[in-house]
């Protein structure tokens, strides 16, 4: 958000901040959230690059479509470990994982 817009909102009584402030997340927790979001985006991109649907990607990853959808949306019930396993199941390698998480 640009400075002018932020100032206008604050003058109208709105409180402006970051998501970590709003949710009360520690720096470590915010890093985990950012990693999950980056990995979810990479999973969608990988699946689409392979020409797979969520159903076919779920079959490849040996899970259900609904669970796979939760992974692609970085649902809070999904662990980072599960997201990584599914990324590898779609053919990603360590280099792709590290590039995704360091971006």
Task: Tell what function each PLM region has.
Residues 50-70:
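Short alpha-helical DNA-recognition segment
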């Amino acid at each position: 958000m640009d400075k002018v817009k932020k100032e206008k909102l604050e003058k109208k009584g709105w409180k402006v901040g970051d998501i970590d402030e709003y949710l009360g997340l520690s720096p470590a927790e915010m890093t985990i959230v950012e990693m999950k979001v980056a990995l979810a985006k990479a999973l969608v991109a990988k699946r689409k690059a392979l020409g797979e649907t969520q159903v076919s990607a779920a079959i490849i990853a040996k899970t259900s479509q609904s669970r796979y959808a939760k992974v692609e949306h970085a649902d809070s019930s999904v662990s980072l470990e599960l997201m990584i396993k599914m990324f590898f199941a779609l053919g990603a390698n360590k280099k792709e994982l590290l590039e995704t998480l360091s971006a």
